Design a protein with these regions (language model features):
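Extracytosolic ligand-binding ectodomains
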Residues: 1-108
């Protein structure tokens, strides 16, 4: 977080920002894996399914229906060291959650 705050003064990191960053990293990992040849659509899809990148949110993988398996957190709104309101993660309330419809998906 320190690197982020130094690079973007006045902005606070967020889970939404982390998800957007992960999306860009996912696409980049696939483009790099196919040597920049984005016409290799099947190879890019296969690489994206591998999710071979380092997420800022920890391990990243997909369920059988291509929805991310992820943690959910309990957070409180608190004042940080600068007196600004921010989210503080209190606990992990669900670990490695897979959406409730994954078992109904034909993509096994």
């Amino acid at each position: 977080m320190e690197d982020y705050r130094k690079k973007y003064p006045g902005l606070r990191p967020s889970f939404y920002g982390a998800q957007a960053y992960d999306a860009a990293q996912l696409i980049n990992s696939a483009v790099v894996a196919v040597g920049g040849d984005t016409s290799k659509k099947d190879a890019m899809k296969a690489e994206m399914e591998k999710a071979n990148f380092k997420s800022v949110r920890g391990s990243y993988k997909y369920g059988n229906n291509h929805i991310p398996i992820q943690n959910f957190y309990l957070q409180d709104v608190v004042k940080d060291a600068d007196g600004q309101l921010s989210l503080k993660t209190v606990a992990t309330i669900v670990k490695d959650d897979q959406d409730r419809f994954h078992d109904k998906c034909p993509m096994k």
